[in-house]
């Protein structure tokens, strides 16, 4: 999605899209899938012919269980005119690996908030060098879903290594996010945000803040990057609907 829209002039528009009605046309005939372990971290890669972009994202066990990664890679290949390598690295302890600081609303585990930087170091110093050795150096997009999307935005404020961010349903309701985002400008050149239109109507009082949090992030991205470099897309449904498609 980000690959297709980097040069678009209408990035700032809110978009509503019901994914189930999207028709895709295959653009890649073959895709190579590799399962690799790097520093004890399982990594699954999907590579099309003649890749032009790296896509990196944290993955959780439910994505593997539901075959979500395979479906995601297939949909990207069908929808994109550009070749790519998608690398999903396992985060079996989701909150520990991705939360940049502690928030009891996410988990009371005292380890939560201590390891997001370690995850970023793994990506920058272990995963990316392996990918570049295997496929060559190319622009790198970081993305994710839920806490993974929040981590992707956080990471893009820590390093200029990522050219773009794809954040689907980012957990920007966590305590302190707005302060962090204001104080740490994003270093990527393009940012894609999405949210389900039912997410801000949930019963959880903290999670109900997500709509305004994402709108505020989108406005901040417009200020930092320009209107044509950021998109906020509204999808039908709640937080757990159509994850691979989104």
Regions found by a protein language model. Give the residues of each.
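Catalytic active-site module of serine/aspartate enzymes centered on a nucleophile-bearing elbow/loop
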Residues: 246
């Amino acid at each position: 999605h980000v690959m297709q829209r980097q040069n678009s002039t209408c990035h700032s528009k809110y978009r509503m899209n019901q994914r189930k009605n999207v028709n895709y046309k295959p653009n890649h005939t073959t895709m190579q899938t590799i399962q690799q372990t790097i520093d004890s971290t399982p990594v699954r890669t999907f590579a099309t012919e003649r890749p032009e972009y790296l896509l990196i994202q944290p993955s959780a066990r439910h994505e593997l269980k539901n075959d979500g990664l395979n479906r995601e890679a297939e949909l990207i290949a069908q929808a994109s005119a550009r070749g790519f390598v998608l690398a999903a690295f396992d985060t079996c302890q989701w909150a520990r690996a991705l939360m940049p600081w502690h928030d009891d609303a996410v988990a009371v585990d005292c380890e939560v908030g201590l390891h997001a930087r370690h995850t970023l170091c793994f990506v920058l110093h272990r995963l990316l060098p392996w990918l570049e050795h295997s496929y060559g150096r190319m622009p790198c997009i970081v993305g994710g879903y839920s806490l993974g999307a929040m981590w992707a935005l956080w990471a893009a404020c820590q390093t200029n290594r990522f050219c773009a961010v794809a954040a689907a349903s980012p957990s920007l309701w966590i305590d302190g996010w707005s302060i962090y985002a204001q104080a740490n400008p994003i270093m990527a050149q393009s940012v894609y945000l999405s949210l389900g239109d039912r997410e801000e109507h949930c019963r959880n009082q903290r999670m109900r803040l997500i709509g305004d949090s994402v709108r505020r992030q989108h406005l901040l991205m417009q200020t930092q990057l320009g209107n044509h470099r950021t998109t906020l897309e509204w999808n039908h449904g709640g937080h757990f609907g159509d994850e691979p498609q989104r």
